[in-house]
């Protein structure tokens, strides 16, 4: 059994060079290293931007991971907030940077992995890999991970990991690959300590960090000390290497939802003069007939503020953009993270903050008070307070058809029987007003069917008073869908999309929680999942983009944007999926077809909306 290393084993840096490992934190608080290739790219960008902090140019503040690995195209690392942001779902993950000696496991490209339940191999966090490598090098065949805070032992002989409480075993393996990147520990002249790369220290002065300022964010301890936490925890423990994080180690929930407010520029460089950058926001809630499990709710709103007026003077500290987050929620994370990515891309420092719940001013004050830097659109909601009475199915059929005395010599495409014979649904559909031999054609398109077949088709749908021709898809009445309850929010930014450089950007955020299927869904009474929410979508803020936005609002009210069905990507059943109205979920890199530039997108989505019965005529009726 391996014992905790003694103080004599503490390693000391004798070189300004070290190996950098970047890791991200999952929802359970476990850290996962990026691959050596991705880490090399991140470190290169980080060092470059860190060098620019000393006056070598403007900063992007964000690192697009897709440039290093195409499979990571949706992900961006936002350096000021030390956050990995997924553009298509809005998911935010904490990231950190570790420095190891060059002779460590990461420096030699050694990675230890364990076999997960789905049959894939998952890498241990870098400090665990290094510890395992050290113990095996000393001849310890059975390594106890308790010094790192884990309730496991790893048997090098059998290549297994054993839970000391449940005795459950997993396979482990040792992989050798490319070494992680070697970096230089940057410190300005006169600085004797290891430079802290946290954004608070980097912004503290224009001459670099000072030795006494690293203690709040950098751990430099004897190798892998016995933790003071319970042995079952999943938080990380650091060794002789330095663990860089933006703040003191927060709680598990706080690390993801409540970053502290930083009041200075993350990199110490003054942003360009933006004048008054307006940020517009509106929200549209859909509260249709939806059954939610106890305790479920939709997310609240997020407010943002932008500084106005001239930029800061060279000797002053520029103001930041605080993102107000009254309650930690996924939509708020998405909005705050998206704002951080957008604003940092133009050089404006953005920091997430946890704000107290604001008190609502009187309505008269809300109506009269306005700000030059923030403009809010009227908040709209749809609350089905008084549902319309359900029309009689037979009457709906009669409203859109004309009965034919002599049926044409053709088949009914619904039941595949001759129109001159009885309806194939006569044995399962009972109606006193429509006979089994009755035939009619739809008034607009003139396609003919058994009227009883049309009745069966209508009763099998939403029964919302509308019909859609099964032959040509012509819509009669106002078509509605089966979209679950959720929320639609809209923001506007003064940044352009590729191919639309002459205008700003419209950001749409859809939020739908998990729930219970209603009578209009495939399996009424059973739960449904809502993966990847909130989802972010982008439109150019020009005349055509604004028209598409207004039509999407109509489609949202009619419950046409999403539905409950089977995912075409994962095969999961009873889950929320898109409903034939395509959205752009990425701002750029149109490799997958979900981003920009795409010169035909707006015309295509207008055609898809029209196929659902949502046209400009709907806007005139509002």
From Swiss-Prot:
Residues 372-381 have a biased composition (Basic residues). One of its GO terms (cellular component) is nucleoplasm. Pathway: Protein modification; protein ubiquitination. Its EC number is 2.3.2.27. Keywords: Acetylation, Cytoplasm, Metal-binding, Methylation, Notch signaling pathway, Nucleus, Phosphoprotein, Repeat, Transferase, Ubl conjugation pathway, Zinc, Zinc-finger. A zinc finger (RING-type) spans 412-473. The modification Omega-N-methylarginine is found at residue 256. One of its GO terms (molecular function) is ubiquitin protein ligase activity. Residues 299-322 have a biased composition (Low complexity). The modification Asymmetric dimethylarginine is found at residues 213, 215, 233. GO terms for biological process: Notch signaling pathway; protein ubiquitination. Residues 249-324, 355-393 are annotated as: Disordered. It catalyses: S-ubiquitinyl-[E2 ubiquitin-conjugating enzyme]-L-cysteine + [acceptor protein]-L-lysine = [E2 ubiquitin-conjugating enzyme]-L-cysteine + N(6)-ubiquitinyl-[acceptor protein]-L-lysine. It is found in: Cytoplasm; Nucleus. The modification N6-acetyllysine is found at residue 249. Belongs to the Deltex family. The WWE domains are thought to mediate some protein-protein interaction, and are frequently found in ubiquitin ligases. Homodimer. May form a heterodimer with other members of the Deltex family. Interacts with NOTCH1. Regulator of Notch signaling, a signaling pathway involved in cell-cell communications that regulates a broad spectrum of cell-fate determinations. Probably acts both as a positive and negative regulator of Notch, depending on the developmental and cell context. Mediates the antineural activity of Notch, possibly by inhibiting the transcriptional activation mediated by MATCH1. Functions as a ubiquitin ligase protein in vitro, suggesting that it may regulate the Notch pathway via some ubiquitin ligase activity. This is Probable E3 ubiquitin-protein ligase DTX2. The gene is DTX2.
């Amino acid at each position: 059994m391996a014992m905790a290393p003694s103080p004599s084993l503490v390693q000391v840096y004798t070189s300004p060079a070290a190996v950098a490992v970047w890791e991200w934190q999952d929802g359970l608080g476990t850290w996962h290293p990026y691959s050596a290739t991705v880490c090399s790219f991140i470190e290169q960008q980080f060092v470059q931007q860190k060098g620019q902090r000393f006056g070598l140019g403007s900063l992007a503040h964000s690192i697009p991971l897709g440039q290093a690995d195409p499979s990571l195209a949706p992900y961006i690392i936002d350096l000021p907030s030390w956050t990995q942001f997924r553009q298509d779902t809005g998911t935010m993950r904490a990231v950190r940077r570790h420095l190891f000696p060059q002779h460590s496991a990461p420096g030699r490209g050694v990675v230890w992995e364990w076999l997960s339940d789905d049959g894939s191999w998952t890498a241990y966090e870098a400090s665990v890999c290094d510890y395992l490598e050290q113990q095996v090098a000393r001849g310890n065949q059975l390594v106890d991970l308790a010094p790192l805070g884990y309730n496991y032992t790893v048997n090098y002989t059998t290549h297994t990991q054993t839970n000391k409480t449940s005795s459950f075993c997993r396979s482990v393996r040792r992989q050798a690959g490319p070494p992680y990147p070697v970096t230089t520990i940057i410190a300005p002249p006169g600085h004797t300590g290891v430079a802290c790369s946290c954004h608070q220290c980097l912004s503290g002065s224009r001459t670099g960090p000072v030795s006494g300022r690293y203690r709040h964010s950098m751990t430099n301890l004897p190798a892998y000390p016995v933790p003071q936490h319970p042995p079952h925890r999943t938080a990380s423990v650091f060794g002789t290497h330095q663990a860089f994080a933006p703040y003191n180690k927060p709680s598990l929930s706080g690390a993801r939802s409540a970053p502290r407010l930083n009041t200075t520029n993350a990199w110490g460089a003054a942003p360009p003069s933006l004048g008054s950058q307006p940020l517009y926001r509106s929200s549209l809630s859909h509260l249709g007939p939806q059954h939610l499990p106890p305790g479920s709710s939709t997310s609240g709103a997020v407010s943002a503020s932008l500084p106005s007026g001239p930029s800061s003077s060279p000797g002053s500290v520029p103001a930041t953009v605080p993102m107000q987050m009254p309650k930690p929620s996924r939509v708020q994370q998405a909005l705050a993270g998206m704002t951080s990515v957008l604003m940092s891309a133009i050089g404006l420092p953005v920091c997430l903050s946890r704000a107290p719940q604001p008190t609502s001013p009187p309505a008269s004050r809300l109506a009269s008070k306005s700000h030059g830097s923030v403009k809010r659109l009227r908040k709209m909601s749809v609350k089905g307070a008084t549902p319309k009475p359900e029309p009689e199915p037979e009457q709906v059929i009669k409203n859109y058809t004309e009965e034919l005395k002599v049926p044409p010599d053709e088949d009914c495409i619904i039941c595949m029987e001759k129109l001159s014979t009885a309806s194939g649904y006569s044995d399962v559909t009972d109606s006193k007003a429509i006979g089994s031999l009755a035939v009619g054609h739809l008034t607009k398109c003139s396609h003919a069917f058994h009227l009883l077949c049309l009745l069966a088709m209508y009763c099998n749908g939403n029964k919302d008073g509308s019909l859609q021709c099964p032959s040509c898809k012509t819509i009669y009445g106002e078509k509605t869908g089966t979209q679950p309850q959720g929320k639609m929010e809209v923001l506007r930014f003064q940044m352009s999309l590729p191919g639309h450089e002459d205008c700003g950007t419209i950001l749409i955020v859809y939020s739908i929680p998990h729930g219970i299927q209603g009578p209009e869904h495939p399996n009424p009474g059973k739960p449904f999942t809502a993966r990847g929410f909130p989802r972010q979508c982008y439109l150019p803020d020009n005349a055509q983009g604004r028209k598409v936005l207004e039509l999407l609002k109509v489609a949202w009210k009619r419950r046409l944007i999403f539905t409950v069905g089977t995912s075409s990507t994962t095969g999961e059943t009873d889950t929320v999926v898109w409903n034939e109205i395509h959205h752009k979920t990425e701002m750029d890199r149109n490799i997958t077809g979900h981003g920009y530039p795409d010169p035909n997108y707006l015309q295509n989505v207008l055609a898809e909306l029209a196929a659902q019965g949502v046209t400009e005529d709907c806007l005139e009726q509002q």
